[in-house]
Amino acid sequence: MASFPCPIEETLLPVPCKVNLRLAVGARRPNGYHDIDTFFLPLPEPADVLRLRRFDGPGDIDLQCSDPELETDDNLVVRAYRAYAAATGYAPRLEVHLAKHIPHGAGLGGGSSDAAVMLRYLNDRADEAALSPVDLAALALTLGADIPFFLLGVPAVATGVGETLIPADPGLAGWCAVVVCPEARVKTAWAYAALDASRALPQKPGANLLTTAFDANKRAFCVTGAPMRNDFESVVFAAHPELGRVKERLLALGAAGALLSGTGSAVFGLFRKRQTATLALAMLTGSGPRAYLAPL
């Protein structure tokens, strides 16, 4: 009878997502990246789950995923593993199952967060080959601009292409976020190209950054002194008007502020009271799109 090796360790790790409380996009750099000024907020829901089985001796990574289309060498989990192995020489034999719950193409950073969890897992077990936090963040940046934030794991203001991080308190303790994930998918490259193209056109005066229901006096909901803002809303909502309607719906249901996350398609609302957020969640899920409640 054939015998099968037993893992020396089996680990189950949650993978959080993020939203952007602010996302201002600057000029395009020669390397294709854009300067940004953003406020990242990690959320516990929706969340992926990584199950890792580590075997004795060196090897490679075998990835299985609840979405078979993501079982490729281009998956950021695989790329993170191989980048870490190339940088440190630490390459344990791993069987990885990725339970995918963070929607792809939603602006919630699911793939980047998956990669950050893999990098942290490897670094915690690499002993003398382990990288310093600075070197680990530098390696993460080669894989994706927001992966260093997920390594940091706390609310932070990010500038540059996202690599310069300053931990910050958004002042939302006790609040709840409701994250709505419509079926639409927005490609990041398209969103940046569309934004660049729109800026080449004559601009209308008085761009409206209002994110609250206070239309009468134009009071903008603020987080640490800056209005909630996402420069991508103009182009993304024009291409996907249903996403703009989700934002309006969140505000109508009592959100103090609402915004597109990243390049979309997810839209989130911030609620002062859990009861109001729970009711909004029930109303939204009854109308179709997936929605999640995340305590802050």
From Swiss-Prot:
Reactions accelerated catalytically: 4-CDP-2-C-methyl-D-erythritol + ATP = 4-CDP-2-C-methyl-D-erythritol 2-phosphate + ADP + H(+)
Single GO molecular function: ATP binding
A Pfam short name: GHMP_kinases_N
A Gene Ontology biological process term: isopentenyl diphosphate biosynthetic process, methylerythritol 4-phosphate pathway
EC number(s) from the headed UniProt entry: 2.7.1.148
Active site: 18, 146
Top-rank lineage group of the source organism: Bacteria
Pathway: Isoprenoid biosynthesis; isopentenyl diphosphate biosynthesis via DXP pathway; isopentenyl diphosphate from 1-deoxy-D-xylulose 5-phosphate: step 3/6
Positions annotated to bind ATP: 103-113
Key words of the record: ATP-binding, Isoprene biosynthesis, Kinase, Nucleotide-binding, Transferase
Keyword Cytoplasm: no
HAMAP family attached to this UniProt entry: IspE
Family: Belongs to the GHMP kinase family. IspE subfamily.
NCBIfam families per UniProt: ispE
Functional description taken from the UniProt entry: Catalyzes the phosphorylation of the position 2 hydroxy group of 4-diphosphocytidyl-2C-methyl-D-erythritol.
Protein's recorded name: 4-diphosphocytidyl-2-C-methyl-D-erythritol kinase
Organism of provenance: Solidesulfovibrio magneticus (strain ATCC 700980 / DSM 13731 / RS-1) (Desulfovibrio magneticus)
